[in-house]
């Protein structure tokens, strides 16, 4: 009889162990996705702040007008099949949205590895790596093979230049910051679309 009384406790212990990995509880899909959205939002806001600060301090009205109408304003991500807005994103599967997001994040890892004056945020690179890892975990959780072979972004961006006395370097940094802001906005949008689709009850805003 003592063995029978012990059995429910043993069963509960075994069930709990199945929900852990290396002694730590595995986060729920909702938590993983919420963390990814928070990191994407942080990077998007950071990129927007740095872009506006840089524009105010280094870019004249004439330069601003000329660069927005030049090939320098082109972002690599515009050559990918990634959705261009939330309505387009809603037509994609969750796995596609994760893969698009991961490709955009990875395109910026090298440029942000060595940060110069134009960006000036030492935690940006770490946040980018955290988000990359978070997206990879989400993809493993949802892996179904449906998105294999999807053509994604193949380029990475140039590194930021620390030379603020060269007009060429200044315009290059301005263009890079503009692209970084656009790409982080895309990543945040994709992840919010995915979160709202899977967990509509969880403070869902896009």
Swiss-Prot record:
MF term (GO), any: growth hormone receptor binding
S-S pairs: 75-179, 196-204
Location within or outside the cell: Secreted
Pfam families from the UniProt entry: Hormone_1
Record's keyword terms, sorted: Disulfide bond, Hormone, Secreted, Signal
Region forming the signal peptide: 1-22
Top-level taxon in the UniProt lineage: Eukaryota
Main subcellular location: secreted
Record GO biological process: animal organ development; growth hormone receptor signaling pathway; positive regulation of growth; positive regulation of receptor signaling pathway via JAK-STAT; response to nutrient levels
This protein's record includes keyword Ribosomal protein: no
GO cellular component: extracellular space
InterPro entries the record matches: 4_helix_cytokine-like_core (IPR009079), Somatotropin (IPR034975), Somatotropin/Prolactin (IPR001400), Somatotropin_CS (IPR018116)
Purpose of the protein: Growth hormone plays an important role in growth control and is involved in the regulation of several anabolic processes. Implicated as an osmoregulatory substance important for seawater adaptation.
Family the entry assigns: Belongs to the somatotropin/prolactin family.
Protein name according to UniProt: Somatotropin
Organism: Protopterus annectens (African lungfish)
Source taxonomy: Eukaryota, Metazoa, Chordata, Craniata, Vertebrata
The gene coding this protein: gh
């Amino acid at each position: 009889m003592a063995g029978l009384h012990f059995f429910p406790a043993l069963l509960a212990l075994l069930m709990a162990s199945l929900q852990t990995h290396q002694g730590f509880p595995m986060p729920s899909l909702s938590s993983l996705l919420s963390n990814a959205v928070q990191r994407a939002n942080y990077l998007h806001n950071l990129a927007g702040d740095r872009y506006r600060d840089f524009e105010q301090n280094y870019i004249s009205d004439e330069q601003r007008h000329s660069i927005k109408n030049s090939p320098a304003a082109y972002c690599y991500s515009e050559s990918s099949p990634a959705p261009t807005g939330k309505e387009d994103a809603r037509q994609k599967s969750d796995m596609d949205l994760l893969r698009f997001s991961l490709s955009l994040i990875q395109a910026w890892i090298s440029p942000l590895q060595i940060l110069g004056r134009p960006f000036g945020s030492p935690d940006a690179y770490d946040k980018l790596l955290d988000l990359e890892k978070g997206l990879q975990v989400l993809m493993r959780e949802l892996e179904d093979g449906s998105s294999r072979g999807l053509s994604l972004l193949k380029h990475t961006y140039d590194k930021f230049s620390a030379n603020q006395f060269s007009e060429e370097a200044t315009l290059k940094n301005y263009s890079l910051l503009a692209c970084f802001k656009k790409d982080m906005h895309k990543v945040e949008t994709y992840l919010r679309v995915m979160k709202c689709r899977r967990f509509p009850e969880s403070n869902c805003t896009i």
